[in-house]
Amino acid sequence: MAKEASGNVYFDVYANEESLGRIVMKLEDDIVPKTAKNFRTLCERPKGEGYKGSTFHRIIPGFMVQGGDYTAHNGTGGRSIYGEKFPDENFELKHTKEGILSMANCGAHTNGSQFFITLGKTQWLDEKHVVFGEVVEGMDVVHKIAKYGSESGQVKKGYRIEIRDCGVLGSN
């Protein structure tokens, strides 16, 4: 397990053809190993099979940015490495600040590939969404992404906020 669980992951994010920068995230392998492995693996897969080329499809300024639907690209799809969905691992970690990385779902035990990054403390999501990491570099990029959102969550017309590249940074 220790061999797999190494290195932070990154997203290189673009708004159409403009680079917004890189987000680097630390995953909590010791606390939520199955959830962290799912996310890390989807960061390593080629375009069409994971996060590379997928978008942030739901962006609510002051709340969160959501992505990870690499199958339908609109919030209705996505798939975990374990099959369609997998159970909530635990709720040990909490939504205590901006930059928290957590699983998006549509109810208990419906984790797939969709995730969100918080833009502030969102404690009402505790016990409902599995926290599995946090942003360690590039929170400014997350705030840039937020500028393309709306209260309804829709991305500003004419913009595609894409994870152009992603992967795992060197082993620790």
From Swiss-Prot:
GO terms for biological process: protein folding. It comes from the Eukaryota. It is found in: Cytoplasm. InterPro entries: Cyclophilin-like_dom_sf, Cyclophilin-type_PPIase, Cyclophilin-type_PPIase_CS, Cyclophilin-type_PPIase_dom. It catalyses: [protein]-peptidylproline (omega=180) = [protein]-peptidylproline (omega=0). GO terms for molecular function: cyclosporin A binding; peptidyl-prolyl cis-trans isomerase activity. Keywords: Cytoplasm, Isomerase, Rotamase. It is an enzyme of class 5 (isomerase). PROSITE patterns: CSA_PPIASE_1, CSA_PPIASE_2. The keyword Cell membrane does not apply. Belongs to the cyclophilin-type PPIase family. PPIases accelerate the folding of proteins. They catalyze the cis-trans isomerization of proline imidic peptide bonds in oligopeptides. This is Peptidyl-prolyl cis-trans isomerase. It comes from Encephalitozoon cuniculi (strain GB-M1) (Microsporidian parasite). The gene is CPR1.
